[in-house]
Design a protein with these regions (language model features):
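Rhodanese-like catalytic fold shared by cysteine-dependent sulfurtransferases
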Residues: 2-43, 47, 55-88, 97-132
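Short, surface-exposed ligand- or partner-binding patches at beta-edge/loop junctions that are enriched
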Residues: 92
Length: 132
């Protein structure tokens, strides 16, 4: 009888651990969407665009209307902290690596609606307009 009670207690404890672990961490990644480039282009007009490449890359050409906040610069966290966390954003970069990093950091900082637009070339190929 003692063995059955111990086994039941272990099962209940395991279920509680699974429920607690499943409940943790889901909120930050839920804020980040990763749509196809075509879908992301359809979202451009309704979002604040952030080019997370270096200032030199940005100066060489960027998606029309985007602002530049370099994700690898030391002041990235302070610059995003000044933004409205409830507003919708779309971040992009050269290859998609840095936009993923930026989107994850923004979600962790409490931003509620972030689209990881990925690579600028994919967005342009899907119809995004650029400016020098």
């Amino acid at each position: 009888m003692h063995r059955i009670a111990t086994r039941a207690a272990v099962i209940v404890l395991a279920i509680l651990v699974v429920v607690l672990v499943a409940g943790c961490g889901g909120s930050s990644s839920a804020a980040v969407q990763k749509p196809s480039a075509a879908k992301a282009v359809g979202m451009l007009d309704a979002r604040t665009l952030i080019d997370v490449r270096t200032p030199a890359e940005y100066a060489a050409g960027h998606i029309a209307g985007a602002q530049n906040i370099d994700v690898e610069a030391g002041d990235f966290a302070s610059k995003i902290a000044a933004l409205d966390k409830k507003a919708p954003y779309l971040v992009y970069c050269h290859s998609g690596r840095r936009s993923g990093i930026a989107a994850t950091q923004m979600a962790a900082a409490g931003f509620a609606d972030i689209v990881d637009g990925g690579a600028m070339a994919d967005l342009v190929a899907a119809g995004a307009k650029t400016q020098p």
